[in-house]
Curated annotation (Swiss-Prot):
Broadest EC class assigned to this enzyme: transferase
Disulfide bonds: none
Known EC number: 2.8.1.6
Residue ranges occupied by any Radical SAM core domain in the UniProt entry: 71-296
Entry's cofactor comment: Binds 1 [4Fe-4S] cluster. The cluster is coordinated with 3 cysteines and an exchangeable S-adenosyl-L-methionine.
Ranges in coiled-coil conformation: none
Protein's organism: Corynebacterium diphtheriae (strain ATCC 700971 / NCTC 13129 / Biotype gravis)
Gene this chain is encoded by: bioB1
Function per UniProt: Catalyzes the conversion of dethiobiotin (DTB) to biotin by the insertion of a sulfur atom into dethiobiotin via a radical-based mechanism.
Residues reported to bind [4Fe-4S] cluster: 86, 90, 93
Protein name: Biotin synthase 1
GO BP annotations listed: biotin biosynthetic process
Length: 350
């Protein structure tokens, strides 16, 4: 059995710690049987589980995702329409124009976006997300995105998502009319920790954009980065902040410290803490697409990535990210085949 092989190197505890007594049994009833996410206090207990119980946690999280999301894995590619030169000060991001990072501003043309969408579709992906490093779109960016979506949809059989910052109601309506079916705008971290990560705009402005997106009928995609110095209590708060959005998708990133940013010297999150977070987020969000995004290669490696895919994750970004290198697309597809996880677009094991 694959899951036994993957988790076999970690012993399963024979006794349970008093302060987390029966939290996984509670989750089995509340989440697995009833489809109800854990609350903040319960998520915190999961995040505090002893290392020896991580295999048990991930096995339960995998059962939850199979029951409430199905066995298929959603594959997505992302592309940057506008890279660098962002006026915001997100402390983790090398695309900010306020930091001395090696990233320089650049735009991709429509032909380049269409070609990238074609290559992404060939992998079996169902999602192609166009991203821009901006606080919010100006008219030039809106017009170019509308043109790009039309061009892609006319030539490529793939769903187009977008991530271009804080929106007005008029911009939300235009994206919906253009055919954008899912919109990504990450909350990034817990509301209480956000001022430690971003000071040039508010957590509430991000939340308001997501409210408008959902009310317009687009799918809501919002996640963030684990391991930016937040406490376990704030990590639990973040999971429940996201659950309140009723999102279609939550991308899980892990901090990959970027040169020149305020977080450049932060330590990489411990693998066991990353696995706890994956399991906990699945138990908080039982019916949501939970996607591996940036930082998994550094934080989890190959084995941890496999554990995550058998521990609650049911979607991946293939290829490179916005400013960091991912794994070659073929490696991820081979891994899904090894684990006998079917890709959604192909509807068959790879």
């Amino acid at each position: 059995m694959i899951i036994a092989r993957i988790f076999g190197h970690l012993p399963i505890a024979t006794t349970w710690e008093h302060h987390v007594t029966d939290i996984l049994e509670l989750a089995r009833t509340k989440v697995l049987n009833n489809g109800e996410g854990l609350n903040k206090e319960e998520v915190l207990q999961v995040l505090q589980l002893d290392e020896a119980r991580i295999p048990e946690l991930l096995e339960l999280a995998h059962e939850v995702r199979l029951k409430w999301c199905g066995e298929e894995v959603e594959v997505e590619g992302i592309i940057s329409l506008k890279t660098g030169g962002c006026p915001e000060d997100c402390h983790f991001c090398s695309q900010s124009g306020l930091f001395e990072s090696p990233v320089r501003s650049a735009w991709l043309d429509i032909a380049g976006l269409v070609e990238a969408a074609k290559q992404t579709q060939k992998s079996g992906a169902t999602e192609f997300c166009i991203v821009a490093a901006v606080k919010g779109p100006d008219e030039r960016l809106m017009s170019q995105l509308e043109e790009a979506v039309a061009a892609i949809k006319s030539e490529v059989d793939i769903e187009v998502a977008a991530s271009i910052g804080i929106l007005t109601q008029e911009q939300v309506d235009r994206l919906k009319a253009a055919g954008v079916h899912r919109y990504n705008h990450n909350l990034e971290t817990a509301r209480s920790y956000f001022p430690n990560v971003v000071t040039t705009h508010s957590w509430e402005s991000r939340r308001e954009t997501l409210r408008m997106v959902g009310e317009a009928g687009m799918e809501v995609c919002s996640g963030g980065i684990i391991g930016m110095g937040e406490t376990l209590e704030q990590r639990a708060e973040f999971a429940c902040d996201l659950a309140e959005l009723n999102p279609t998708e939550v991308p899980m990133n892990f901090l990959d410290p970027r040169p020149g940013t305020p977080f450049a010297d932060y330590e990489v999150l411990d693998t066991t803490d990353a696995l706890r977070a994956i399991g906990a987020f699945r138990l908080a969000l039982p019916k949501t697409i939970l996607r591996f995004a940036g930082g998994r290669e550094l934080t989890l490696g190959d084995l941890g990535t496999e554990q995550g895919l058998l521990g609650g994750i049911n979607a991946v970004i293939v290829g490179n990210y916005l400013t960091t290198l991912g794994r070659p697309m073929e490696q991820d597809l081979d891994m899904l085949g090894k684990l006998r996880l079917p890709i959604k677009a192909l509807n068959a094991s790879v």
